[in-house]
Regions:
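Glycine-rich phosphate-binding active-site loops on the catalytic face of alpha/beta enzymes
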Residues: 132-149, 186-196, 233-253, 280-292, ...
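Hydrophobic faces of well-ordered beta-strands that scaffold small-molecule active sites
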Residues: 54-58, 88-90, 115-118, 138-140, ...
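C-terminal helical cap(s) of enzyme catalytic domains, especially alpha/beta-barrels
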Residues: 199-209, 231, 243-261, 297-307, ...
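Glycine/Thr-rich beta-alpha phosphate-binding loop at enzyme active sites
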Residues: 60-71, 77-98, 177-206, 287-291, ...
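Catalytic cores of alpha/beta
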Residues: 122-133, 171-180, 220-239, 267-278, ...
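Glycine-rich beta-to-alpha transition loops that act as phosphate-gripper elements at the mouths
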Residues: 59-61, 70-72, 97-98, 117-125, ...
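An N-cap/entry alpha-helix motif that binds or orients negatively charged groups
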Residues: 2-71
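N-terminal active-site wall of soluble small-molecule enzyme domains
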Residues: 65-158, 162-165, 173-176, 202-205, ...
Length: 456
């Protein structure tokens, strides 16, 4: 089989590889007197094969972003990732990514998951070092390796029972990877010339990869919307900067995997903790006496203190701005969900929202619950949804759409439901105006507490 020579390596990548080559003597010296490591017993391939998987990355810096996280503690980050990921990637390149083999060892000692050594591997000594410090898998980039070099490195990896994530960026590299026997393909969406992102690369290349292989999409996986878009083409995602750049990595991980998700009607600390453990990002606290799940501000403070991993939303039907100001003053409340009925006109809706925002001095986001089956007992028109005498599902949907459009610019999020909410019924999601999808949440029906998920 021919010995393919990689295309001209982009300058940034070439510089990194050139520098990494100068590190090889130091790496060899670092592990010179240690016994041979034991083969790995943790399989990244097995964990990824199930699908809907995430390789979450420990990374403190990158060429495109510079310093990502000043307070970088790989062990602490790994403890968070271990709750959600199928594997953990650890940067080991020191100059551009701030990595080190000690970071790899710290993560391997912390987690039960397989650990990927993320490095620019060009020599077998790097693979032995990776295994010594706890790696269960390595990254091999076809953009910097010939076929012969890949085979040499793959043989060393197999010696230690390490999985290989083979990175590809072109159709030619996909064909090479297939010929080389790769079983985990990492499609890198980043342009190695200018560091830009092209997410169409994943579906374009995925169709050329055999069905029995595992496909991972790398780079540019910034939110749950991207995950949902690319999910049909891949088994999982490798995500680094989007997580380690965030102040709250645990929250960022849940939001990436599940989207913005609110469990409403929490009445106890245990319920809040269960919501967070299930992947929720927000907890809804109901301050409405008519609700069987209503709580007092005192109880709210106890719940909030018990689960700092959630962002809390105060839910009420009140139209009194001063009452909303009192709720916004509760420490830990990050959003106010106005659940009152339609106010009779768009102008009245605007006035209510503006008054609440002014009274709360922008201390919390404003969310508006909107019935996508129209205001209670009515259907409507564009200007005043409550005035129309038309009947039927179509006009009801139009009334809900116009209500949502009327208030969208004045609120931070729309919570879309059927009727007044709490009915356990749903509406046709296709009626959600496309231009509003990015700021909407869907109120879930079913057994309480019901989830509310972002639609993007």
């Amino acid at each position: 089989m021919h010995n393919h020579t990689p295309d001209a390596t982009p300058t940034i990548l070439a510089d990194i590889v050139r520098a990494r080559r100068t590190h090889l003597p130091d790496i060899a010296h670092r592990i010179r007197n240690i016994p041979e490591p034991q083969p790995s017993t943790r399989s990244l391939y097995h964990n990824l094969k199930a699908g809907n998987a995430f390789i979450m990355e420990c990374k403190s810096a990158s060429p495109s972003l510079g310093l990502i996280r000043a307070d970088y503690n790989p062990s602490t980050i790994a403890q968070i990732y271990s709750q959600y990921a199928a594997g953990i990637s650890v940067l080991c390149e020191p100059e551009r990514f701030g990595g080190d083999y000690d970071h790899l060892a710290a993560v391997a000692a912390t987690t039960h998951l397989p650990v990927l050594c993320k490095d620019f591997i060009i020599d077998p000594i790097q693979i032995r070092a990776a295994r010594h410090y706890g790696a269960d898998a390595i990254l091999l980039m076809l953009s910097v390796l010939t076929d012969a070099e890949y085979r040499t490195l793959a043989a060393e990896a197999h010696r230690w029972n390490l999985d290989i994530l083979t990175e590809v960026i072109t159709e030619t590299e996909v064909a090479r990877a297939i010929n080389l026997g790769a079983n985990i393909f990492g499609i890198n969406n980043r342009n190695l010339h200018d560091l830009s992102i092209d997410l169409t690369r994943t579906p374009t290349l995925a169709r050329h990869i055999p069905d029995d292989a595992v496909i991972i999409s790398e780079s540019g996986i910034r939110n749950n919307a991207t995950v949902r878009t690319l999910k049909p083409y891949v088994h999982g995602f490798l995500v680094g900067s989007q997580l380690t750049s965030q102040p709250n990595i645990d929250y960022a991980a849940r939001e990436l995997i599940y989207g913005t998700t609110k469990i409403c009607g929490l009445t106890s600390p245990a319920a809040a903790q269960a919501a967070r453990a299930a992947g929720a990002t927000h907890g809804g606290l109901i301050f409405e006496q008519a609700s069987p799940r209503a709580i007092t501000p005192t109880t709210a403070r106890t719940i909030i203190a018990a689960e700092p991993g959630l962002k809390f939303v105060a839910v009420s039907r009140s139209i009194n701005p001063e009452e909303w100001a009192e709720l916004a003053a509760i420490p830990g409340i990050t959003a106010l969900q106005i659940h009152s009925p339609y106010q009779g006109s768009n102008d009245a809706e605007h006035a209510l929202i503006d008054a609440i925002r002014q009274a709360t001095d922008n201390r919390a986001e404003i969310w508006r619950a909107v019935s996508m089956t129209g205001p209670t007992g009515t259907t409507g028109t564009a200007n005043q949804p409550g005035e129309s005498d038309q009947a039927g599902p179509a006009s009801q949907a139009e009334a809900g759409q116009e209500w949502a459009r009327a208030v969208a610019d004045r609120v931070d999020k729309l919570v879309l439901d059927a009727g007044d909410g709490g009915s356990g019924t749903s509406f046709n999601w296709e009626t959600i105006p496309a231009e509003l999808a990015g700021k909407t949440l869907l109120a879930g029906g079913g057994h309480p507490p019901a989830p509310t998920r972002t639609r993007r």
